[in-house]
């Protein structure tokens, strides 16, 4: 199974399977985006001149994340909204479901700016 410990190997395998590199990658999260940045640079690709990369979630734990374009997710608001919805669902199991949107902010960095 794919997990945090196997991301690098799985991404390398995925890159090897591509007949041609795309112009850009939009990653599911910043952790994957930072791994991808390293692997693409290791292959001699220039970021962003040859290929652009973006992440999602503004993970500040990785030093590479400073160069990664990302979407800043309001995690506190997301957690509070989720908890509220769970409590509501427990109290009202037959009510209709809702679709809820939370605004994100795109933070443009050097991984997409050329």
Provide a role label for each language-model segment.
Residues 1-8:
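Short beta-strand elements in bilobed, periplasmic/extracellular small-molecule ligand-binding domains
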